[in-house]
């Protein structure tokens, strides 16, 4: 609880608080959803995550909540060693949505509780990294430049896909 109070104090002093979780690790007890198909159905964790986010939001002047980032099935630097079409085939948007259902449900509930709050925004990285069918872990198939440093952290190139939205929120 002490760390929440520290976050709260820092958030009160900041123009903008950006909050991002490793939802897969917290809700599923696993670093990457590709490594475990079994979800932890722990309702208390979901409730606690919702309460923590709302607590930090209530301390913040303005807040951006970053949704779950699609996990890459491979460590970013190794992407050049695999067949790109195989990687793309194993990373559907449907798979991402299924594995992140709990986190997306929590974010949806938070969004519903804040729909009239102009100082609260949600950025869903999958909207920038996925099309209607699949999520991309490379810039394009002709230029296999990875969008990730590892399995869950975006590289500079990957981050550029969402940082413009964050910058526009800073300017509002």
PLM regions: where:
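Extracellular glycan-modifying ectodomains
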Residues: 1-172
């Amino acid at each position: 609880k002490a760390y929440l109070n520290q976050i709260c104090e820092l958030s009160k002093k900041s123009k903008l608080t950006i909050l991002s979780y490793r939802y897969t690790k917290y809700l599923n007890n696993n670093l990457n959803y590709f490594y475990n198909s079994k979800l932890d159905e722990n309702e208390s964790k979901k409730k606690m995550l919702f309460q923590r986010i709302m607590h930090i939001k209530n301390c913040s002047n303005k807040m951006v909540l970053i949704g779950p980032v699609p996990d890459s099935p491979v460590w970013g630097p190794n992407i050049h060693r695999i067949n790109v079409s195989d990687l793309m085939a194993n990373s559907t948007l449907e798979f991402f949505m299924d594995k992140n259902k709990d986190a997306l449900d929590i974010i949806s509930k938070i969004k519903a509780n804040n729909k009239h709050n102009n100082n609260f925004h949600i950025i869903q990285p999958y909207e920038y990294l996925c099309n209607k069918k699949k999520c991309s872990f490379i810039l394009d198939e002709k230029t296999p430049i990875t969008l990730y440093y590892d399995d869950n952290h975006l590289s500079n190139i990957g981050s550029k896909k969402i940082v413009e939205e964050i910058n526009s929120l800073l300017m509002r």
